[in-house]
Structures are given as structure tokens and as C-alpha cells.
Amino acid sequence: MKRNKTNRCLVVVVTVVFMLCPSLSGLYAQDPLPPIPRVLEPLHLPGQTKEMHSSGRLIVCHDSLPDNFKHTADNVIEDSTRSLLPFFRKLNEMNGPVRVVHIGDSHVRGHVYPLVTRRRLESDFGAEAVYPDSITYRTDGLAHETGEPGLVYHIMGVNGATCVTFTTEDKIKKIAALQPDLVILSFGTNEAHSRRYLAPAHEMQIDRLLSMLKKACPETVFLLTTPPGAYVGRRRSRVINPRTVTVARIIREYACKHGMAVWDMYTVVGGKTDACKNWTRNHLLRADGIHFTPEGYRLQGNLLHQALIKAYNEYVATGLE
């Protein structure tokens, strides 16, 4: 009897260990993460649903930011020239595959953040254009097309990348071969991490990449995004990266100057004063102060989806003119 009780206790202990420490097996995102992330206290999300009512095919859009995120901004895409109009028109008509290519650094390479956006957009506009797949950190992020109408969302991230990383003939050819209708560019974290960062050089690097992409993909439209924020320094003396605010500003100014769309995630989640504090307060930032937990990346993916759908609904509500 005593031995049976002991065995039962051991089973319970082992079970609890594996429930609390799923990192004992597998990989999930860009760094060794569990296949099922550790359980965090659920984020308190606002319950209100934002829905636009008008003629045309509008998509229901839910708020994504936790209530306790401080000094946030409206989660919208800035696009004063309506440069994304051709992409949204194709989404609305859906006469064939509509292709998105999302390029960027390790935040994109981890697949969690862009994959959430992809799955939600597939739910909105149809997943018939791609074969069912299971994307993990060990797989690539490319979708496999069926030829049917629907959304196709390709993910191309490189750990440690800056926008310069993609200014090679090989990478430009790979992007162009996917025939994107929209390219999303998510860089800035690694630019900001360099102590030798210079804003004029950064602007030139963005311009070089976009010039190469425009030449290779003349019918494509572009969406720039700003980084989510990060810390720098050793763990005991870590501080909020002071260069991120400049990096985000350069990306915004470049987009404005060249009539391009920009999603300013950095400002949306709290900007200079609170972005990093908001991530940390909700246990969404990993111990390195740069990368995020799976739940943190899922929130970013939901935010990007929300911003895209808000912009899409606006175009539909105004007659796509």
C-alpha cells in the first residue's frame, strides 16, 4: 500500500513538472521555446468589438491591446496617399491568389508573430489558395499555393537581420519570384541595437532595399513597420534601448516622404516612455530583453491583423476609390 501511494505521488510530481516545464521537449519559436508555451495569466483584453456597418464586404475587427498597456496610440496604418488601395481592391475582388510577403528579422523568423496575422487573414479572406501546413521554427515560412483564389502569406525572416541583409540579388529574386501584391518590411530592432547607429545611414539603407524591391516588383505595394522596443546592456544594468525611438522615427519619416504606408507598432504599444514597460509588465518579453514570449508574439500578430483590417474596412467603406 505504501509503495502504491509512493508511485502515485511520483506520477503526480512528474505530470506537474511536464505541465509547468513544457520546455523539456521541442522548439516553438525563434529560440528554444516549448511546443506549448508555459501558462501565463491571461491578458485582460477589452471586450468591446469594433465593427463598421456599410455597404460592401466589411470584416469584424476586435481590439487587441491589454487594458493595462499605458500611453498607447490608435492601432492604425498611416497611409496618407492610399498606397495600399491596389492591394485592398484585390482582396475585395478576390479573383485569384492575393499574395503577401512578410520579410524581417528574428521577430519574423520565429514565425509566431506573422503566422498569427496569416491565419487571421486566411480566416477573413479564405485559405483555399494554400495547402494546409504546419509551420514551426524548424520549417520555412513559405506557403504552398493551390492556384485557387484566396490569401497567400509568405514569411521570410532572418535572425539578426537589418534591412541591409535583404539587399542581395539572391534575396530580391526570391521575393520577386513569389509575385507579391504586398510586401511587409519589419526591421529596426537590430539597427537600434548597434551603438554605431546613424540615422542618415539607416535612411539610405531603407531606400536601397526599397529601390531594389520596387525595381524587381513594379506592381507591388509596401508596408513598413516599426520595431516593438527592446532593452540593451547586461542583465543587471539593462536599460530601455534609447535608439529605438530614433529608428522608429526614421522609418515613419521615410514612409511619409515616399508616400508609403507605415504601421508604427512602437508608438501603438506605448512608444518611448512605455513600450518596453508594457511588454515587461505583462510578462511578454523574454529574459534577453529583446525577444518575446509566444504570447507576446501572438499579441503582435493580432495587432498587425487588426491594423490591416481597419485599413481594409476604411477603403471598402469609401467605395475603394
Task: Give residue spans per PLM region.
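Conserved catalytic region of serine esterases and O-acyltransferases that act on ester linkages
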Residues: 30-80, 136, 140-141, 282-321
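Extracytoplasmic/secreted cell-surface and envelope-processing proteins
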Residues: 36, 110-112, 192-199, 231-236, ...
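Conserved, well-ordered alpha-helix/loop/beta-strand core segments that scaffold catalytic motifs
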Residues: 184-188, 206-210, 214, 221-226, ...
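Bacterial Sec-dependent N-terminal signal peptides
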Residues: 1-38, 321
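Catalytic His-Asp segment of secreted/periplasmic serine-dependent ester chemistry enzymes
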Residues: 27, 227-321
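Conserved SGNH/GDSL esterase-like catalytic core that processes O-acyl groups on lipids
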Residues: 99-102, 107-204, 208
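Alpha-helical scaffolding within the catalytic cores
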Residues: 78-91, 140, 164-176, 204-212, ...
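Solvent-exposed, polar/charged alpha-helical surfaces in well-ordered, non-transmembrane soluble domains
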Residues: 111, 115-119, 173, 200, ...
